[in-house]
Regions:
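Flexible, glycine/small-residue-enriched loop-and-beta-strand segment within the central core
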Residues: 49-123
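Terminal amphipathic alpha-helical/low-complexity segments used for targeting or macromolecular assembly
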Residues: 1-67
Length: 123
């Protein structure tokens, strides 16, 4: 869990550095839906890995309702993700996003049609 807290801090700090509209880290924490989606995802992913799948999915659905960004709790997201203008973003269950990535509105890392194994792209 401590790793998740550190990653959340790095996400907020990264947004401050990349987005000239951000005033400070508190501005990002309270007012950026892209940050909120990442925050909810990191919590849901942690719970998903502990096999609390239902609670993890519930958290991801709440995040989607509030942010318009859908991230499956099984998706693996690296450090310092920046989601800018994130409406309509979908990140699937087996998607992997590396460190230092930026994603803009309308991006879908969706399924390939396979029923099993790796179904979503890597970034």
């Amino acid at each position: 869990m401590f790793k998740a807290i550190k990653d959340i801090y790095l996400d907020a700090k990264n947004i401050c550095q990349k987005d000239p509209a951000s005033k400070n880290i508190l501005y990002v924490i309270f007012l950026y839906p892209g940050f909120h989606a990442i925050l909810f995802h990191r919590i849901a992913h942690f719970l998903n890995n502990l096999n609390f799948k239902f609670i993890a999915r519930l958290i991801s659905q709440i995040a989607r309702f509030f942010t318009g960004i859908e991230i499956h709790p099984g998706a693996k997201i690296g450090k310092r993700l920046f989601i800018d203008h994130g409406m309509g973003i979908v990140i699937g269950e087996t998607a992997t996003i590396g460190n230092n990535c930026t994603i803009y509105h309308g991006v879908t890392l969706g399924g390939t049609g396979k029923d099993k194994y790796k179904r979503h792209p890597d970034l």
